[in-house]
Amino acid sequence: YNTPNTESLIRLREKVLSAPPLLEKKQRILHIGRLVKWKRVDLLIDAYAKICPNYPDSELTIIGNGPEMENLQYQAENLGLTGRVVFVGAIYDPFTLGQYMHESSIYVLAGMGGLSINEAMCYSLPVICSVCDGTEKDLIQDGVNGYYFESGNADSLAKSIEYLLRNPQMMKAFGDVSLKKIQEEINLDTVSSR
């Protein structure tokens, strides 16, 4: 699971941090991944619909392509979320992906897996996910740098997102822990490879 070379991610992060912002400033909830059923992006959209009215400055940004794209766009439209759920399509450029992560507030994985947890943590993001295959356990500590929600439960997911949106200081504290964990992991790697 120790996916993208963490050191090169940190180097990339330094470039991203010094670049001018790409996006309008918002409380951005981010998901990156192929739009396939088992990623449960539909669940994320449902959860966002529940809290969206209370956070006019928030946006759900979905990066990725896949067979579920049309269904998900239709779902967002039906829920009255046009303009609040933004489908970006696939982005393959690591720098641009980094900019999106840097300019987001929370990273959410609603379904199965994604190597993107490491990357999101590099950009000091709190992570919300369900326990899927256990690899998350090494990275995300519930109530420390993210939350686990009850798998398949939109209310539980909405509650976790809302809790962070409502507590910006905590969101920042969680994000700081994420980055620290990644930096420590790098140091461990460096130590163990000597």
PLM feature spans:
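A short, well-ordered alpha-helix in the C-terminal region of glycosyltransferases
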Residues: 84, 156, 163, 170-185, ...
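Short alpha-helical donor nucleotide-sugar binding micro-motif in glycosyltransferases
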Residues: 90, 97-104, 120-121
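Acidic anion/phosphate-binding donor-loop and adjacent secondary structure
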Residues: 1-26
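Short acidic/histidine- and often glycine-rich active-site loop of Leloir-type glycosyltransferases
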Residues: 118-122, 132-143, 147-148
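Nucleotide-activated donor-binding/catalytic signature segment of Leloir-type glycosyltransferases, i.e.
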Residues: 70-91
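Conserved donor-binding/catalytic core segment of Leloir-type glycosyltransferases
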Residues: 21-39, 43-50, 61
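Conserved acidic donor-binding segment of nucleotide-sugar-dependent glycosyltransferases
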Residues: 142-143, 147-154, 163-169
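Acidic donor-binding loop of glycosyltransferase active sites
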Residues: 99-112, 125-126
